[in-house]
Regions:
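Conserved Walker B catalytic segment
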Residues: 1-40, 45-49
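Exposed, interaction-prone assembly regions rather than primary DNA-binding/catalytic cores
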Residues: 57, 233-258
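Short, amphipathic alpha-helical interaction segments positioned at domain boundaries
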Residues: 208-239
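Conserved small helical "lid"/interfacial subdomain of P-loop NTPases
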Residues: 57-85, 91-92, 103
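Winged-helix-like regulatory helical subdomains adjacent to P-loop NTPase cores
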Residues: 101-179, 226-232
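A short, conserved structural fragment
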Residues: 190-200
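Accessory beta->alpha helical hairpin/"wing" motif in late/C-terminal subdomains of nucleic-acid enzymes
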Residues: 198-211
Length: 258
């Protein structure tokens, strides 16, 4: 598990190529191994020119059917409602297993106390002491500390938190750095899977992490109005067609949505 952490030993004399030596060794072994890592880009780069014995298997996001198995029929009044809830949870969680599980557990807790819906569950989970707020914070810090240039990378993520789909030039202007140094920073963010580039425009790899950055990478803790506004902005384009009323209901209970 997390085999790339062997890089920790590279700071010791004689172990500067420990990760490459490890890969070369297991490539020659008659045994079979299963290696895992959360760092997709780094793994692909390491194995790119290695033995054909290595097969990279990407873990796909959860489907609606997978999500329904986790959420369970008990979370709804009938089969149609259960499927709709599963679709909403899967969309809000971007199919990510940890997020789906957190939403499913929060929905279960809410319904034990009289009701709840996926949007209000997401808002509760992103509150300062919420489960998803803590999980996103952990992933954010873990990945940043595995990259170089912590301060500059954090500034870029806050820029993309405000507006996604920016070009290298636009980011460098807002960062007030040269395009060359900004390109290096962006490559380091891509290296730990925090951002992706499509048609030379940069965005968060994890859309829910962007919501967390907007809410929690600021001088003060988010208010209920802040939570309602950001969850509304995130959820509205992702929910099934008939779901926006839920978003407005949650927004109305927590604050005014502009």
């Amino acid at each position: 598990d997390e085999f790339l952490e062997l890089r920790t030993f590279e700071s010791f004399p004689g172990l500067r190529r420990v990760l490459h030596d490890f890969i070369d060794c297991i490539a020659l072994s008659p045994n079979k191994f299963v290696l895992t890592s959360r760092y997709v880009v780094r793994t692909l780069r390491l194995l790119r020119d290695r033995s054909a014995r290595f097969e990279v298997v990407h873990l796909p996001g959860l489907t609606v059917e997978d999500t329904l198995d986790i959420v369970g029929m008990s979370a709804a009044s009938d089969a149609a409602d259960a499927e709709h809830t599963a679709r909403s949870v899967q969309a809000l969680a971007d199919g990510r297993p940890a997020y789906v599980r957190a939403l499913a557990d929060e929905l279960g807790t809410m319904r034990e106390h009289g009701g709840g819906d996926p949007v209000s569950a997401l808002a509760a989970l992103l509150a300062p002491d919420g489960r998803l707020a803590k999980l996103c914070g952990f992933c954010y810090e873990l990945r940043l500390h595995r990259a170089r240039g912590y301060g500059a990378l954090k500034a870029i993520l806050e820029i993309l938190g405000e507006e996604e789909g920016l070009t290298l030039t636009e980011i460098s202007q807002r960062l007030r750095r040269t395009p060359g140094s900004t390109k290096d920073y962006l490559s380091w963010l891509e290296d730990v899977d925090l951002v992706t580039a499509r048609q030379k425009r940069y965005s968060f790899s994890d859309p829910l992490l962007r919501v967390w950055v907007r809410l929690h990478c600021r001088p003060t803790a988010p208010s209920d109005d802040d939570l309602a506004r950001e969850v509304h902005r995130y959820a509205l384009p992702r929910l099934p067609q008939q779901e926006p009323a839920l978003v407005m209901a949650v927004a109305g209970s927590s604050g005014i949505i502009e």
